């Protein structure tokens, strides 16, 4: 008699909150937010930067970063230390589930392979079967505005499966190809942003004290 092999998932995506493809013109600034679910920012074109908690980050085409639950984050086009801004296209996916393993991704930037970039394309294609999309050049998929019924059966499950594939690929990459995963390059961001980081850390440590 054949003996079954039990599949024990490392992670599981159970909820999708937002799925965006934004084409931002130079000069765009998002002041920031925090929420109780995970979020990915992937740069499809151009460069972007911002704060992930107290840590500054910079992303170029083909790179992505995780924003952890309840961690403040913001975003701007271009790079913090550059005088010249630039257009930037990004994909933003926010999601929830059994994702404790992602804690090790904190404050790291991933450079994606062709395989991983193609997963993003497949996710967007499936999103068209689940969500209304409108807003000029931007493709907006929102949980608050889904179709009553999927255009294609299983589209939501496909999005979850594809996202799990991406996360598992990044998990393996961190273990097997650390050269494609980097800690946030704080030393290259200049004194101004080091000062911002120190101020935020000070405020966090003295949240309930008189300053």
Where does each model-flagged region fall?
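Double-stranded beta-helix
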Residues: 96-119
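Short hydrophobic beta-strand segments that form the core of ligand-binding sensory/regulatory domains
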Residues: 39, 74, 89-94, 111
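Amphipathic alpha-helical segments that line or abut small-molecule/effector binding pockets
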Residues: 114-121, 125, 164, 168
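Short beta-strand His + acidic residue motifs that chelate non-heme Fe in jelly-roll/DSBH
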Residues: 49-51, 67, 73-84
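A short hydrophobic beta-strand segment most commonly corresponding to one strand
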Residues: 66, 82-102
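Generic protein-terminus/edge-of-domain signal
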Residues: 1-59, 63-64, 71, 103-104, ...
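Short, Lys/Arg-enriched, Trp-marked, Pro/Gly-tolerant hinge/linker segments that flank
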Residues: 134-139, 144-161, 167-210
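Solvent-exposed, amphipathic alpha-helical segments
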Residues: 46, 119-126, 130, 195-206
